[in-house]
């Protein structure tokens, strides 16, 4: 993990197209401004982790559904 220190009004760049500016610091909260390309997706961590978990569960269900469908197909062909 890269750890940086910035004061309000100071910024940093990621590659050439993402600028992150510290807008303010109040107590334990830091307000950031992000200048990013429109096609860049940004999620809060808790939302991102939930999406990843839902995708994982959907993939598991798909595998189980495919196995069940294969079994049904094989039973149907035996008749």
Swiss-Prot record:
Q: Which UniProt keywords apply?
A: Bacterial flagellum biogenesis, Cytoplasm, Repressor, RNA-binding, Translation regulation
Q: Provide the protein's localization.
A: Cytoplasm
Gene Ontology BP term (one): mRNA catabolic process
The organism's superkingdom is given as Bacteria
One CC-aspect GO term: cytosol
Question: Molecular function terms in GO for this entry?
Answer: mRNA 5'-UTR binding
Check the record and name the PANTHER family matching this protein: CARBON STORAGE REGULATOR
Q: How does it assemble?
A: Homodimer; the beta-strands of each monomer intercalate to form a hydrophobic core, while the alpha-helices form wings that extend away from the core.
Membership in a protein family: Belongs to the CsrA/RsmA family.
Protein name, please?
Translational regulator CsrA
What organism does this protein naturally occur in?
Maridesulfovibrio salexigens (strain ATCC 14822 / DSM 2638 / NCIMB 8403 / VKM B-1763)
Q: What is the lineage of its organism?
A: Bacteria, Pseudomonadati, Thermodesulfobacteriota, Desulfovibrionia, Desulfovibrionales
């Amino acid at each position: 993990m890269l750890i940086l220190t910035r004061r309000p009004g100071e910024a940093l760049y990621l590659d050439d197209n993402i600028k992150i500016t510290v807008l303010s610091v109040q107590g334990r909260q830091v307000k950031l401004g992000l200048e990013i390309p429109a096609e860049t997706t940004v999620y809060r961590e808790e939302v991102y982790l939930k999406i990843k978990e839902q995708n994982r569960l959907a993939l598991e269900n798909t595998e189980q559904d495919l196995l069940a469908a294969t079994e049904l197909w094989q039973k149907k062909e035996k008749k």
